[in-house]
């Protein structure tokens, strides 16, 4: 099997790690996609576990514009929660579903380059695509790479990368289709109703109105960047929704479609 244009990059958030049924459903979806010959990459966050570990160590969680502020002294705890506990929880769920996986992080095999994103955010990284060879090899075996959003700078320091942005960069690296999965069915309007499609102008308007904010703002901006880069829609959907998971297996559109500029 060689790498094809069927690479599907799925991103999941930390809330999934607190839901065994959700993890089982996601991995069953991945298994069915792999059995169809699709190639799947899973990128994950783990904010809930990070918050728990920081609290247990007497440290507080601070966010700026939806991004986690990461002081250097918190980095060992964050790296352990994401590249360690979160990653292995997902590998365990993959094993239960009969999926062969490989636990990885953005540090591995030169897949990305990473620099400090903004001094105000501390050890938060901004990544760019670099070398796809390792991922292409893993995908060609029919395995599922499960990738945490911990990266490494040129001088070896660990950096915390927003998982939506990490998934976006890997979709660019592989020329793949990106689906951002969270615990909500997509982007919702002010009345809590799913918005089926959004372009950049509509996103700007909803941000100004405060309908899209914080973590969803980061997610939608990452999705829009990839949509523009690849010239195809990026989907924002839910791992909680069994109907959306079934549609994903069939290759149907799910959730909110973030559209590229025409």
UniProtKB/Swiss-Prot annotation:
Q: Which Pfam families match?
A: AA_kinase
Localization of this protein: Cytoplasm
Q: Which InterPro entries match?
A: AceGlu_kinase-like_sf (IPR036393), AcgluKinase_fam (IPR004662), ArgB (IPR037528), Asp/Glu/Uridylate_kinase (IPR001048)
Its gene? argB
Pathway field of the UniProt record reads: Amino-acid biosynthesis; L-arginine biosynthesis; N(2)-acetyl-L-ornithine from L-glutamate: step 2/4
Q: Which Gene3D superfamilies match?
A: Acetylglutamate kinase-like (3.40.1160.10)
In which organism is this protein found? Answer: Shewanella amazonensis (strain ATCC BAA-1098 / SB2B)
Q: Main localisation, per the record?
A: cytoplasm
Key word NAD present:
no
Q: What is its EC number?
A: 2.7.2.8
Residues engaged in binding substrate: 46-47, 68, 160
Q: Which HAMAP family match?
A: ArgB
Site entry (Transition state stabilizer), positions: 11, 219
Which protein family is named in the record?
Answer: Belongs to the acetylglutamate kinase family. ArgB subfamily.
Task: Give the CC-aspect GO terms.
Answer: cytoplasm
What protein name is recorded for this chain? Answer: Acetylglutamate kinase
Q: Which UniProt keywords apply?
A: Amino-acid biosynthesis, Arginine biosynthesis, ATP-binding, Cytoplasm, Kinase, Nucleotide-binding, Transferase
Any one Gene Ontology biological process term?
L-arginine biosynthetic process
Q: Name one GO molecular function term.
A: acetylglutamate kinase activity
State the reactions this protein catalyses. N-acetyl-L-glutamate + ATP = N-acetyl-L-glutamyl 5-phosphate + ADP
Purpose: Catalyzes the ATP-dependent phosphorylation of N-acetyl-L-glutamate.
Q: Which domain of life is it from?
A: Bacteria
């Amino acid at each position: 099997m060689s790498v094809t244009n069927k690479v599907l990059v799925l991103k999941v958030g930390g809330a999934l790690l607190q839901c065994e049924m959700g993890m089982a459903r996601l991995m069953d979806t991945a298994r069915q996609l792999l059995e169809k010959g699709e190639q799947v990459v899973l990128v994950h966050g783990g904010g809930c576990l990070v918050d728990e570990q920081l609290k247990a160590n007497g440290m507080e969680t601070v966010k700026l514009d939806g991004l986690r502020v990461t002081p250097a002294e918190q980095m060992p705890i964050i790296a352990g929660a994401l590249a360690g506990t979160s990653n292995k929880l997902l590998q365990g769920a993959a094993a239960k579903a009969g999926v062969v996986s490989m636990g990885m992080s953005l540090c591995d095999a030169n897949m990305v380059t990473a620099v400090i994103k903004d001094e105000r955010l501390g050890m938060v990284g901004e990544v760019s695509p670099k070398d796809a060879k390792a991922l292409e090899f893993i995908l060609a075996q029919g395995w599922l790479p499960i990738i945490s959003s911990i990266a490494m700078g040129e001088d070896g320091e660990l950096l915390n990368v927003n998982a939506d942005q990490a998934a976006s960069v890997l979709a660019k690296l592989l020329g793949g289709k990106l689906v951002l999965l969270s615990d909500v069915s997509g982007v919702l309007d002010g009345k809590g109703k799913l918005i089926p499609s959004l372009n950049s102008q509509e996103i700007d308007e909803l941000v100004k109105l405060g309908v899209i904010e914080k973590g969803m703002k980061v997610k939608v901006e990452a999705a829009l960047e990839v949509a523009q880069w690849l010239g195809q829609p990026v989907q924002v959907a839910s791992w909680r929704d069994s109907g959306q998971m079934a549609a994903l297996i069939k290759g149907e559109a799910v959730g909110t479609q973030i559209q590229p500029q025409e």
